[in-house]
Amino acid sequence: MNNSEFSKIAETTIAYIAEKIEEQDKEASIDVDLQGDILNLDTDKGVYVINKQSAAKEIWLSSPVSGPYHFFYEQGKWTNRAGLELMAILTEELNIKFDTRPT
């Protein structure tokens, strides 16, 4: 995947995460702040940070619950080396339902 393709997929994914949280968080318990390619989610558990790392072609997640993760895009999913999927972690920790393939 070239840099342009990566940027498009990563930015679409990050925007999708922000949109899904805003749609499903009926009690407005998660403060969503999307600035460029950095998404901050302020929750009662702490602040999540999701951003794209262009040089590594990864999306990084900093979770106040489970720590830091680096995800690479493969076969339509953002997965880390341990096989964990970005959307699965967010679903579990934020109680928001995400499709595994938003793009």
UniProtKB/Swiss-Prot annotation:
It comes from the Bacteria. One of its GO terms (molecular function) is ferroxidase activity. InterPro entries: CyaY, Frataxin/CyaY, Frataxin/CyaY_sf, Frataxin_CS. One of its GO terms (biological process) is intracellular iron ion homeostasis. Gene3D superfamilies: Frataxin/CyaY. Pfam families: Frataxin_Cyay. Keywords: Iron, Metal-binding. GO terms for cellular component: cytoplasm. HAMAP family: CyaY. NCBIfam families: FeS_CyaY (TIGR03421). Involved in iron-sulfur (Fe-S) cluster assembly. May act as a regulator of Fe-S biogenesis. Belongs to the frataxin family. This is Iron-sulfur cluster assembly protein CyaY. The gene is cyaY.
